[in-house]
Amino acid sequence: MAEETNQSLEDQNVQVEEGQTISDEAIEQAVEGAEKELDNAKKEIESLKDSWLRERAEFQNYKRRTANDLLNARKESIKKFAEGLTGALDNLERVSNVPNQTPEVVAFVEGIKMVQKEFYSVLEKEGIKRLDPKGQPFDPMLMEAIASEESAEFTEETVVETYQAGYYHEEGESKQSIRPARVKVGKPQS
């Protein structure tokens, strides 16, 4: 601070010779000038600090958005991939359910069932599950009602028959339909 005062005095062209005294007014002016410079420097530091904090917060938000975007892109890729597999899985299901199999075909069908099981295992690791809701309450988010029947035996809308299995992606409590199960719904009589 003494250096700033001397600098301020030099700026005011005050020359002090040895043995001379500086007036109180000159000292006050030098101190006021130094205090103004200090206040300006503090304000600039505060401004730069605020700017840095805003930039840091913006960068943190950018990182969070990017991570969410990557996660959503991954989920969407898995979903698209699973959508493409549903037809092939349906065909494997049809082959494995062929009635009146000859002994030669039985071994082949068993191999198909093993491949089918492996597909389901891989899909489940990614949170994709097969839905065959026969006997379960009807869920319009995961099922599509193709037909319905009314009966006194039903107290709520219940799946009576599954025409085509559905697939959904499960993450925590959330279930997102990939392909709805096509079902026949039993309804209570009105």
UniProtKB/Swiss-Prot annotation:
Compositional bias segments (type: Basic residues): 181-190
GO molecular function, one term: unfolded protein binding
Keywords: Chaperone, Cytoplasm, Stress response
GO biological process, one term: protein folding
Subcellular location field: Cytoplasm
GO cellular component, one term: cytoplasm
Highest rank taxon of the organism: Bacteria
SUPFAM superfamilies referenced in this protein's UniProt entry, alphabetically: Coiled-coil domain of nucleotide exchange factor GrpE (SSF58014), Head domain of nucleotide exchange factor GrpE (SSF51064)
Residue numbers spanned by region Disordered: 1-22, 170-190
Classification via InterPro entries: GrpE, GrpE_coiled_coil, GrpE_head
Function: Participates actively in the response to hyperosmotic and heat shock by preventing the aggregation of stress-denatured proteins, in association with DnaK and GrpE. It is the nucleotide exchange factor for DnaK and may function as a thermosensor. Unfolded proteins bind initially to DnaJ; upon interaction with the DnaJ-bound protein, DnaK hydrolyzes its bound ATP, resulting in the formation of a stable complex. GrpE releases ADP from DnaK; ATP binding to DnaK triggers the release of the substrate protein, thus completing the reaction cycle.
Subunit: Homodimer.
Family: Belongs to the GrpE family.
Name used for this protein in its record: Protein GrpE
Species in which this protein is naturally found: Leptospira biflexa serovar Patoc (strain Patoc 1 / ATCC 23582 / Paris)
Lineage: Bacteria, Pseudomonadati, Spirochaetota, Spirochaetia, Leptospirales
Annotated gene: grpE
